[in-house]
Amino acid sequence: MYILDKLVVLLRLPKAVAGELVRLWTIDDHTYCDLVKSWLGYHPALMQDNYTLQTEDGITFYLGFGTYGKDYTSWSMDAKLEFNPAKVGNSRWFKNLYQMLIQRSKFIDFRRFDVAIDIPVPRSQLRLLKDNRKYTLLDYGGENRTEYSGVRSNHGQVKVYNKALEQGLETDLTRIEITVDYANSSWRE
């Protein structure tokens, strides 16, 4: 079985949208999810205003506004939404937020996603073949090991780990996650 495990969407929105959402979160309005935490980003690769949000079921996701260091003298600003569709897909709160963001956006870029493949075998029966990319092995003993090939959150990164251990399952389940950057992918891949 495979699923879309993580999706990163870049948007260009009117500046007023961020203000409206923050106002709703501060008055504890549950139309567009609950605010868990907020922080400022001080690096060009980060968003300036960052938020961890929570659905009515307690599932968290990320929303950021304004690329750090970019001048936003016009009416619009960048936004970044990062979420797991399999987890938030049934949330009424998330659907409200997502629909509002998509409707108000002047630009939408489905930037990056992870494809997760679950295989019902013990983790010890699968090995990640090394190539010339960065390779990392986190071995905690027995079935508790995670292998990475490639740079984190970059196109082509592969991660193999024991999903059964993570989920506390009695059956064997190993997950392979592949990161795909839409701009760098091709149909041949």
Model-predicted segments: where are they?
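Structured, helix-rich domain cores that form ligand/interaction pockets
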Residues: 1-189
